[in-house]
Amino acid sequence: MNRAEKRGFKLYCNTQKGEKIYIVLFDIIDNLATEDSKKIQNRFEIENTGKSIEIAAGYLYKLLLNFLVQKRVEKSIQAKIFRQIEISKILFDSKLYDDALEELAIGKKMAEKYEDDIMQMLICRIEMLQLESLGFVGVSEKELVTKHMKLQAMMKYSRTINQHISLLDILNHRLLYKHYHTIEEEKEMLIDLVLSELHIISNSNYIGFQAEKIHLLFQSAYYIEVGNYISAVRNYKHLIELFKENFHLIQNPPIYYLNAIVGVLESLFAAEIYGEMEHFIGILHGMRQEKYSVDFLLKVSWLEYYYTMMILFQTGNWHKIDEVENSFKECLLKHISCLPLDIQLEYYLLKALILFGKGHLKEAQKNLKPVFSSGKIFQRLPLFRLIRIINLLIIVEMGGDDFVDVEIAALKRNYTGQNLSKTERLILRFIQDYPLPRYSKMKIKIANFYTNKIKIIRKDKLERRVLKYFDFLTFIESKLTGVSFQNLLRNKKMAL
């Protein structure tokens, strides 16, 4: 909750009768700013001897939900449409039939304006039930048939949209949890979804905002995954224009609009076109100034922070990193634990990579400790594998090679169903070569081996998934040539 919502909740509580112990609990939770329930309970028992925290928490939970639901009605279009439906039902039960149908018609216009197919179908069904209860007075057979035809058309459209969304969800799931050796293999495994999506588009008679939005999201996600970043950027820019043309259809918070911005940034970042990313990062910064929910604003802050930091890191501009870090300390970094687990894991990885790149090995290893000490909560996430590899790299850089071979064998065994990428296999081989040889002949031999491997991997677009977080190939080059990792990153940026 933001400050205005907290203030509004306390005003709402003032309208309630009885003893308000739950407000004391609310203040304790707000002031302590901790997720440790024991600390909260101890403070509550100190300030309210003999009072039950369970009862206070239960009542606080109930009041918070009631308050937030009321606030949601003020912002949510769907809640406003539901309100019109309830008004219509009340009027109809009060035998004010004409007024009831008028209120329902207002809700219907709102649903049509915002292209909410579910609400449109619900309103049509309620309208049919009301007309049936009235014996279809004043409604001709032709008008009745027309109304039913509209309802059937809406049901067909809704079914098409749901089929389209299901394809997009399956695509995203495959991209998250399936791994392929080559672009050709990936294209082959995704071809069924691509053909199904094209079939839906070609056989749909309705072309509107929702259908176009889902089509562009699907195509863009596919293009990013197969390495066609130019087409992905083009589609995402088209999607952003579509949102601007239909601004009233953007959700509050604008989740799909945010996805489009992130899609452009991800495509440009993967293609290493860093110069054009500044404009879209600026859009994220502008979104932070709007009055959206706290969770949404926290996610937007994270995205602005993440892409800004990654650009600085990947281009070797490390002297600006601390300044950016300080600017996000209050609005984001103190609240990392409030973000989803995948973002928390991404934060730990980003922080460790920066420390590792700067040579602060002990700090980098310490930064990853929460990940490994949290049990299995992070282990199911795809990024956990990369963190294990980075941790191994930190260990050998610190001069410790105990159990490294055992850990590498365990890592390969754990991911037998998820093929390691070429980059991951190469960096694991490189880790096993520690300590690196000092004699010139062996140095030349090992350098030639890795140089040839690096040339092959750089041509493979599929490897950008791993390299976008940390340029392992440039790191290997820095260790073999003696040139600092930071300088090689800077030189690479100048060559782009």
Would you name each region that the model predicts?
Residues 1-192, 204-206, 413, 429-430, ...:
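Flexible inter-repeat linkers and adjacent short helices
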Residues 128-144, 150-158, 168-176, 263-273, ...:
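Alpha-helical linker/edge segments of TPR/alpha-solenoid repeat scaffolds
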Residues 82, 86-90, 119-122, 126, ...:
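"A position-specific structural signal for the A-helix of alpha-solenoid helical repeats
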Residues 105-113, 146-156, 192-204, 237-249, ...:
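Amphipathic alpha-helical segments of tetratricopeptide repeats
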Residues 373-441:
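Active-site/pore-lining binding-face segments in mid-to-C-terminal subdomains
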Residues 115-122, 158-165, 203-213, 247-259, ...:
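Alpha-solenoid helical repeat architecture
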Residues 58-62, 95-105, 136-148, 180-199, ...:
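Helix-turn-helix repeat elements of alpha-solenoid scaffolds
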Residues 138-142, 159-276:
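Alpha-solenoid helical-repeat scaffolds
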